[in-house]
Amino acid sequence: TTGCQIIIADGLKGSDEVEVPVVGGEYVKNAKIGRAVMDADVFISLTHFKGHEEAGFGGCLKNIGMGCGSRAGKMEQHNAGKPHVAQKHCIGCGQCRKICAHGAPIITDGKAVIDHDRCVGCGRCIAVCPKDAVRIDWDETTTNLNCKIAEYTKAVVDGRPCFHISLVIDVSPNCDCHSENDMAIVPNVGM
C-alpha cells in the first residue's frame, strides 16, 4: 500500500459535488464533479487501460471523466434521460420521495411520478425502490457516451495543473468495475 488516505471525492452519499461549466460543451453544459477533485490544487491521475462494454475501452480520458463525476454525473454520462416510474410495478410506498433531496418524486393516486423539472438525476430513488419500479433509459449511444466522457474530462482538467500516468498492464476485456477479472487481452507493456 502507499499509505495514502482515501478520500471519496463526492462524499459518502455521492451528493457532494460541484457543477463545473464545460466551455463549448455540446453534450454537457455543466459537469457534476466530486467536490474533492475540484478542491485539489493539482490534479494527478494514475490510470490503467481496460476494455469497456459501452465506451470501447477505458484509459486516461474515460477514467477521469467517469471517475471524477459525482454519482449524478456518472448517471448523466451513462443515460439518455432522467428516471421514470414503471407504474405497474410501483406500490406507492414513498421510499423514493423520502430519499429525494429535491422533492422530485410525487405520490399521485397511490403511485409515484417523477417531476423531471425538479429531478437532478442523482439516482438515489432508483437504489431505494423495493420493487425496482424506478427506472432509467440506459440506451445511450457509444458516440454520445464518449463525447460526454470527453466533456467531463475537460471540466476536470481545463485551466489547472495536471499530470497523467497511464499503465498498459492487466488489460481486461471488460470494465474493472465488475468484481471479477478476465485474462489480459494484450501483453503487459508498462507505462
Model-predicted segments: where are they?
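Extended, low-polarity segments enriched in aliphatic/aromatic residues
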Residues: T1-M191
